[in-house]
Amino acid sequence: MRPVWAEVNLENIRHNFREVKRLARQAEAMPVIKANAYGHGAVEVAKALIAEGAKRFAVAILDEGIKLREAGIDAPVLILGYTPPEEVEKLLFYNLTPTLHHRELALAYQERLERLKKTLFYHLKIDTGMGRIGFWYEELEKIEEVLKLKNLEAEGVYTHFARADEQDLSFSKLQIERFNIVLKHLKAKGIEVKYRHAANSAAIMRLPEAHYDLVRPGIMLYGEYPSRDVPRELAHLKPALTLKARVSQVKKVPAGFTVSYGSTYVTSKATLIVSLPLGYADGYFRRLSNRGVVLINGKRWSIAGRVCMDQLMVAVDETERVNPGDEAVLLGKQGEETITAMEMADLVGTINYEILTNISYRVPRIYV
């Protein structure tokens, strides 16, 4: 096995799902396992969550749904993103549920389904303030028209929050009001759908009025909080992924020794330069050059020089005992020290979501 790997603790994911269900109460939880389950491995995570009681899943794209089916997972799967109408046959074959988010798309689906003499279940997306895909909440006539199309059966209607992870929840509450306008209109017209849903991880924790029939846990399943503005006491989450590598070489070098491309790191004293066999092609951000930290022997050590495509170097005190083959942790816990995805995100100038989903296919996932 490659001396770089990500350990995924499935029991921690199951624990986090239990926290979701505790918060959701009567609403059903639909785990979001898009982007390879946020880098954790969609198939393995889905199987673990099914064992914990999950009955349906959400993904972003058609291929993610197909991968689940090919792995033998037959639970309902909602595709949250855009699926072109020419993929209708695949949706039918794999029994996947698309999202319809504008009138022209729905009509194109209806035309193909009519020709095939088939009916397809779908969920209707409402834009209440995200400004992304979806019928604008005021387009009530178009929404009603689509919901009455033949060969298409609306199983659900949903929206997505733009700012539920911020300290100020006023915009999220406005989005709830807008979504309720649509729901009340449909009820007045005698149009019923089985599932109404809106809540992402932040809303699951902070906006119980947004739980409706389904909630869509994403980042919290993997032990991460949506932002620093979401109070930690709302849910006890356990991070599920640890990124590890084995030391490839140790060099004892004098003061004035330069390291990596551009010689941007120069030792100020005698130092151990420890090489690790992973780099930005594995999803370890180049922006962590001379900024990131690595755990070796349960202590924090700084990245020395620029992160390379396939390797990086760490500056360790010359008195430390480090040997080739020793284990280093780049994300997660070693001893009493922890490097969090949020900490890494702050250094890079991004969010913890990107830290996790950026871990590339080259890194084997090991399930513990």
Curated annotation (Swiss-Prot):
Belongs to the alanine racemase family. It comes from the Bacteria. CDD domains: PLPDE_III_AR. It is an enzyme of class 5 (isomerase). This is Alanine racemase. SMART domains: Ala_racemase_C. Its EC number is 5.1.1.1. Keywords: Isomerase, Pyridoxal phosphate. Gene3D superfamilies: Alanine racemase, Lyase, Ornithine Decarboxylase, Chain A, domain 1. InterPro entries: Ala_racemase, Ala_racemase/Decarboxylase_C, Ala_racemase_C, Ala_racemase_N, Ala_racemase_pyridoxalP-BS, PLP-binding_barrel. The lineage of its organism: Bacteria, Bacillati, Bacillota, Clostridia, Thermoanaerobacterales. GO terms for molecular function: alanine racemase activity; pyridoxal phosphate binding. Its cofactor is pyridoxal 5'-phosphate. Catalyzes the interconversion of L-alanine and D-alanine. May also act on other amino acids. Pathway: Amino-acid biosynthesis; D-alanine biosynthesis; D-alanine from L-alanine: step 1/1. It comes from Carboxydothermus hydrogenoformans (strain ATCC BAA-161 / DSM 6008 / Z-2901). GO terms for cellular component: cytosol. One of its GO terms (biological process) is peptidoglycan biosynthetic process. The gene is alr.
